[in-house]
Regions:
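P-loop NTPase nucleotide-binding/switch module
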Residues: 19-41, 46-55, 59-62, 68-74, ...
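P-loop NTPase catalytic core
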Residues: 143-144, 150-472, 486
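N-terminal accessory targeting/assembly segments
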Residues: 1-25
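Conserved hydrophobic positions within beta-strands
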Residues: 8, 56, 79-81
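Short, conserved beta-turn/loop elements at beta-strand boundaries and strand-helix junctions
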Residues: 12-16, 62-65, 86-89
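C-terminal amphipathic alpha-helical interaction region
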Residues: 461-507
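Short coil-to-beta-strand transition motifs
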Residues: 1-5, 71-78
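PDZ-domain C-terminal substructure recognizer with occasional recognition of PDZ-binding tails
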Residues: 81-86, 93-96
Length: 507
């Protein structure tokens, strides 16, 4: 019901702010909603209207979000509205509407919804393939491997590769109405970090605190196993509740490996047959059913809502071949591989551009959307930079073996062009005010600029010249990324860049 935004829950939806002490006491439960709060209710239906489960009866405002009060999700068949209260202030347990079902029984409706967390809500008309780009402001995601509204993605990576910073950046900048964070089985200090940092973050879309539209579900690794298993389901169910209101929800789970470990412990205790690595035999179907609950839906009243799900996977020892990563890879459509090597070189975000992928780029619906909203050459250019990065990596290996003199100068040029793509497009400073968020218009300008340089032919006598020249170029481009888009400073750097390119290009 209303009153969940900016709350901190545990995996069983106990309100953590109402509890005291370091550990939860056995058998201690708290009610997740505030029974004393008063909400201003505005009716959306009138007496005699026909309604079904999850139809909107009225709306209340919470933290500037219009939340809908709906017919109970468990209601079967078509009901008729017998009475509805006038606009006014009510508590969550007050009856706001009385319905008559097909058998003539009266159903009293208040603002509270109850639903079992492990069952998916299917109260929508259809679930089309998602197609609308979800802007995150992170170039390595938006430009190279885009995720869509209602899409699924996962981020595997060993410790210290920046999973949490990347998640913070996405949750802060992505175009979502509600953000839900499920900290499932993380170390206690990381959960405390979320509790202390999130209230400080300012929402760039509204200028108010990000916490106003966030729900945190925290389960540290020393909480009971059953709660850890339930926490991810609880988060998904809350997300489905908001999706039924026609809102865009972003759900972040950190980390799904700990959730899978909880599944493993439960199944081992129940003496089920163990599968690979002692995980349950049906791990793949559990994971795919769970990911299948996310998505973009058309509701019965013609509105649309979406759940975009991004889960992190922290495989033991960074081994990407273990069952959780393998099974997640089958169902998630976007894969952002964070790697230790890039993190050690301080190339953040440390997403490996060659191993990572987004299957949405191949969707005809997505191509049509991009052609309409950006331009029709966009996807071709994105594929070109991926090819150039791959080629650059191959040449880097050759240079490593044969030495700088052992390969032709043209090879050095190809390698440095791929480095230019890496430094200018892939790398981004999450702590710089301007560089942290790159709008699509600016990403398009950066991509076009880099592609134009890559298409230019240059003349050099030896490999030292290539290196010095491209380092100068990368430096100017970096300064452009740090300056405000189309400001005087930006234009100045652009002029410098044009002069530098003209200096060496083949006439």
């Amino acid at each position: 019901g209303p009153g969940m935004l900016s709350k901190n829950y545990d995996g069983l939806q106990n309100d953590l702010d109402k509890m005291d002490g370091v550990f939860l006491k056995r058998g201690q439960y708290t009610y997740p909603l505030d029974k004393g709060s008063v909400w201003h209710f505005v009716p959306l239906v009138s007496v005699g209207d026909k309604v079904e489960a999850s139809a909107w009866l009225g709306q209340v405002d919470e933290n500037f979000q219009p939340l809908k009060i709906m017919v109970p999700f468990t209601q079967k068949g078509v009901c008729t509205v017998k009475s509805i209260v006038p606009e006014g202030d009510y508590k969550i347990e007050d009856v706001v509407a009385v319905l008559v079902d097909e058998e003539g029984n009266t159903v009293e409706v208040n603002m509270i919804q109850k639903w079992p967390v492990k069952r998916a809500m299917t109260n929508y008309k259809e679930k089309p393939r998602p197609f609308k780009l979800l802007e995150t402001g992170v170039r390595v995601i938006d430009t190279v491997n885009p995720i869509v509204e209602g899409g699924t993605g996962f981020i595997p990576g060993p410790f210290g590769t920046g999973k949490t910073v990347l998640q913070h950046a996405i949750s802060k900048q992505a175009e979502a109405d509600i953000v839900i964070i499920a900290a499932c089985g993380e170390r206690a200090n990381e959960v405390v970090e979320i509790f202390t940092e999130f209230p400080e973050l300012v929402d760039p879309h509204t200028g108010r605190k990000l916490m106003e539209r966030t729900i945190i579900i925290a389960n540290t690794s020393n909480m009971p196993v059953a709660a850890r298993e339930a926490s991810v389901y609880t988060a998904m169910t809350i997300a489905e509740y908001y999706r039924a209101m026609g809102l865009k929800v972003l759900l972040m789970a950190d980390s799904t490996s700990r959730w899978a470990q909880a599944l493993r412990e439960m199944s081992n205790r129940m003496e089920e047959l163990p599968g690979p690595d002692a995980f349950p035999m049906d791990l793949s179907s559990i994971i795919s059913n769970f990911y299948g609950r996310a998505g973009y839906v058309k509701l019965n009243n013609g509105e649309s809502g979406s759940i975009t799900f991004i889960g992190t996977v922290s495989p033991a020892g960074g081994n990407l071949k273990e069952p959780v990563t393998e099974n997640t890879k089958k169902v998630a459509r976007c894969f952002y591989a964070l790697e230790q090597d890039r993190a050690d070189k301080k190339r953040y975000p440390a997403v490996n551009p060659i191993d990572s992928y987004s299957k949405y780029i191949e969707y005809p619906e997505f191509e049509a959307y991009i052609a309409e909203h950006i331009n029709d050459e966009w996807i071709g250019k994105v594929n070109e930079i991926k090819t150039r990065l791959q080629r650059g990596k191959e040449i880097a290996e050759q240079i490593n073996i044969l030495g700088d003199d052992g390969v032709p100068v043209e090879y050095h040029v190809i390698f440095w062009k791929s480095e230019l793509i890496d430094f200018v497009i892939l790398q981004q400073d999450a702590f710089d005010e301007i560089d942290a968020v790159t709008p699509m218009e600016r990403q398009e300008a950066i991509l076009n600029m880099v592609i134009d340089i890559c298409h230019t032919e240059f003349e050099f006598d030896n490999f030292n010249e290539v290196m010095d020249y491209f380092k100068k170029m990368i430096n100017i481009c970096k300064q452009m990324n740090y300056s405000k888009f189309k400001s005087e400073q930006y234009e100045g750097f652009q002029k410098q860049l044009e002069e530098l390119v003209a200096e060496r290009s083949v006439k």
